[in-house]
């Protein structure tokens, strides 16, 4: 079968021919329809320090997808041939304390599809049936293919009660924009998103965010005054991993504010901890998606009218995968979809 693989320990990704993966007793064989390129895939393409320490070579990569069930392991129940599915990219052990306690998203032995085991940038993918999620008929293939990053956004945004709250989102990448859209959809009062990338801030405006602020050109305190905010933000969603953005968030949070952090800083990050202490801030780290509560919430949000379509900006045939990676690496894109049909 055709597959995109990390063949060499250097920059790039390559189209290869690999065997169709073997179906285990508890697995599903999925024929891939569409995949989306994640920031993680760009890290792997660039072969940065994280990738060099993490990714085995050679390996099929990718973890954002939608496809059709074409094979079912003999122990699997609840699925049938032809079911349209996406899937949770974190394969958990089932045996650690968190798994046995129902907190599978916190499994200490998590293995990543397309990171530690063969991924979805291929004509076929095998995953445990436990990890598959059936896609409702009224959700398109395009949207289903980005459920993985949408899940990061939903998990982060819905960490706290947002109704009537003022929310600051730092980082207008696709996940940050989707998190801001979720916050607005579920009843936040003001949702402000910050970045320095004007292309992505314009995407946020198309998604109906209250204010998309280029912090290289505008002062966040001026924006808060314009919105009639006198006490600071109630909820912060840190999606950028940029130390200056997190420090600004700490500066502008209200006392008793709550922060969910998904963005990964590039290295050690120094902050003024007295602001955390004296403001009584609550900071929560976010990893992946809650299994599978986040997935049900994703489907319900879309079915209740949340429109994510502006975030998908580029579509290519898999034969033009290089154009897709070029678009992602340029910073001038939202989500990029690769079609395998």
Curated annotation (Swiss-Prot):
Catalytic activity: L-threonine + NAD(+) = (2S)-2-amino-3-oxobutanoate + NADH + H(+)
Sequence positions that bind Zn(2+) 2: 93, 96, 99, 107
InterPro entries documented for this protein: ADH-like_C, ADH-like_N, ADH_Zn_CS, GroES-like_sf, L-Threonine_3-DHase, NAD(P)-bd_dom_sf, PKS_ER, Zn_alcohol_dh
UniProt site (Important for catalytic activity for the proton relay mechanism but does not participate directly in the coordination of zinc atom): 148
Involved pathway(s): Amino-acid degradation; L-threonine degradation via oxydo-reductase pathway; glycine from L-threonine: step 1/2
PROSITE patterns, sorted: ADH_ZINC (PS00059)
Gene Ontology CC entries for this record: cytoplasm
Positions annotated as active site in the UniProt record: 40, 43
Top-rank EC class of the record's enzyme: oxidoreductase
Residues annotated as binding NAD(+): 175, 195, 200, 262-264, 286-287
Cofactor note: Binds 2 Zn(2+) ions per subunit.
Residues involved in Zn(2+) 1 binding: 38, 63-64
UniProt EC number: 1.1.1.103
Compartment list: Cytoplasm
GO biological process: L-threonine catabolic process to glycine
Pfam annotation, one family: ADH_N
Quaternary structure and partners: Homotetramer.
UniProt similarity note: Belongs to the zinc-containing alcohol dehydrogenase family.
NCBIfam families assigned: PRK05396.1, tdh
Main function: Catalyzes the NAD(+)-dependent oxidation of L-threonine to 2-amino-3-ketobutyrate.
Protein name as it appears in the record: L-threonine 3-dehydrogenase
Species the sequence originates in: Shigella boydii serotype 18 (strain CDC 3083-94 / BS512)
Source organism phylogeny: Bacteria, Pseudomonadati, Pseudomonadota, Gammaproteobacteria, Enterobacterales
């Amino acid at each position: 079968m055709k597959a995109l693989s990390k063949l060499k320990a250097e920059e790039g990704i390559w189209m290869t021919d690999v065997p169709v993966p073997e179906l285990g007793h508890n697995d599903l064989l999925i024929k891939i329809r569409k995949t989306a390129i994640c920031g993680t895939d760009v890290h792997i393409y660039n072969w940065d320090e994280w990738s060099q320490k993490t990714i085995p070579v050679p390996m099929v990569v990718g973890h954002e997808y939608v496809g059709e069930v074409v094979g079912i392991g003999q122990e699997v129940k609840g699925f049938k041939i032809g079911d349209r599915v996406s899937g949770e990219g974190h394969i958990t052990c089932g045996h650690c304390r968190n798994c046995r306690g129902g907190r599978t998203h916190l499994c200490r032995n998590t293995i990543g599809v397309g990171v530690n085991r063969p991924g979805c940038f291929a004509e076929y993918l095998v995953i445990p049936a436990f990890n598959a999620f059936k896609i409702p008929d009224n959700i398109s293939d395009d949207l289903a293919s980005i459920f993985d990053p949408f899940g990061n956004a939903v998990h982060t945004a819905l960490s706290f009660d947002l109704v009537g709250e003022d929310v600051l989102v730092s980082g207008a990448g696709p996940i940050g924009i989707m998190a801001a859209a979720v916050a607005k959809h579920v009843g936040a009062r003001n949702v402000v998103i910050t970045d320095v990338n004007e292309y992505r801030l314009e995407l946020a405006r198309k998604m109906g965010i209250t204010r998309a602020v280029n912090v290289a050109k505008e002062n966040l305190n001026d924006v808060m005054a314009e919105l009639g905010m006198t006490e600071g933000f109630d909820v912060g969603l840190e999606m950028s991993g940029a130390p200056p953005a997190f420090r600004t968030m700490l500066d502008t949070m209200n006392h008793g504010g709550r922060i969910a952090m998904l963005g990964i800083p590039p290295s050690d990050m120094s902050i003024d901890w007295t602001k955390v202490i004296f403001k009584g801030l609550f900071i929560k780290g976010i990893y992946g998606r809650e299994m599978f509560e986040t997935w049900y919430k994703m489907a319900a949000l879309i079915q209740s009218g949340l429109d994510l379509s502006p975030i998908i900006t580029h579509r290519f045939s898999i034969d033009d995968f290089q154009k897709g990676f070029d678009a992602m690496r340029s910073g001038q894109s939202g989500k990029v979809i690769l079609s395998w049909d």
